[in-house]
Amino acid sequence: MLMIRSLAPALAAGTTTVVKMPGQTAQTNAMVARIIAEAPSLPAGAVNIFSESGSEGARRLIDAAEVPVISFTGSSATGRAISAAGARHLKRFGLELGGKTPHLVFDDADLDAALPVLEKSLTVFAGQFCMTGSRLLVQRGVAERLRERLAQRLENLRVGPAADPRSDMGPLIDKANVERVERAVRQAIAAGARVVVRGGPVTEGELAAGAFYRPTLLEVDDPDLDIVQQETFGPVLTLQVFEHEEEGVALANRSEYGLAAGVWTRDVARAFRVARKIRAGTVWINDWAKVYDEFEEGGYRQSGLGRLNGVAALDDFVEYKHISLTTGAA
């Protein structure tokens, strides 16, 4: 769970914590609270959890002078808002925010290895993941083959309840988000995006009562369209074609986000050269979403401040003090 990445270093640093959980995950919240309450090594009051659908409780935490640190995972817009609200207290903020992860696929990439991963990078959590691979940047020599093969995979993908082992992708969190994602797709098409796979809300059958959204693939020429630049937080993928390495890197960096990226190539020298040029906190080479607890994770620019995981995760929750003693002066 994302919450544990903030809670664990806070407890390791010896702090007490108040955790605000979203109302949409009430069952998970209750389970976490029960596990923590039963942990014999945690003193009563070390971890305090509450759930809410609104923001009143969260606002009180941000406004409280006695709360020196806020660790937040969520959208960049909300991260900016809480930073501004807490600035008068000079609060310390650790912010894991939005992303618009690009996958750069070069002509020499192993498509058989890449395609299943590219599909999963869009459909895991139905795209409701800050590291969702939502931008596909493909070198022209392989673009047609990749487009056709990925489209076939997305069209054949089975949407259904997450508890059903036959499902390839589960639902969005609620119907309001289905409407939000569909609105973004419609606006993109109206602005010139070309439909490769037109998914959309499931409106018929037994799934119609749920918040199910079939994956969508749009090809775009304009890198400044909102669907390319703004986090969609749903199973919507844009495809852009580039000619050469420098153009691909420029497209990858043409975003206010900088959380993660993927590079697909058999050329090891190029893989590391491109990875160093991409402005993102995590870059995978021929893979996606390999995150290790022992290594620091976080974003550049609008994707956040600070780091989670690794030793650096403690930095948000500790203060450094310098004590100097002059001997013989007493």
Regions found by a protein language model. Give the residues of each.
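Rossmann-like NAD(P) dinucleotide-binding subdomain of oxidoreductase/dehydrogenase enzymes
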Residues: 1-113, 242
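Alpha-helical segments flanking ligand/cofactor-binding loops in enzyme cores
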Residues: 8, 59, 80, 84, ...
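A generic structural signal for well-ordered alpha-helical segments
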Residues: 10, 86, 150, 188, ...
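Structural detector of well-ordered beta-strand residues that form the stable sheet scaffold
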Residues: 11, 18, 48, 94, ...
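ALDH superfamily catalytic-core signature
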Residues: 38, 45, 69, 77-222, ...
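Short glycine-enriched loop/turn motifs at secondary-structure junctions
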Residues: 44, 64, 97-99, 130-131, ...
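CheY-like receiver
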Residues: 60-61, 117, 251, 274
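Conserved C-terminal structural/oligomerization subdomain of aldehyde/semialdehyde dehydrogenase
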Residues: 67, 104, 158, 208-330
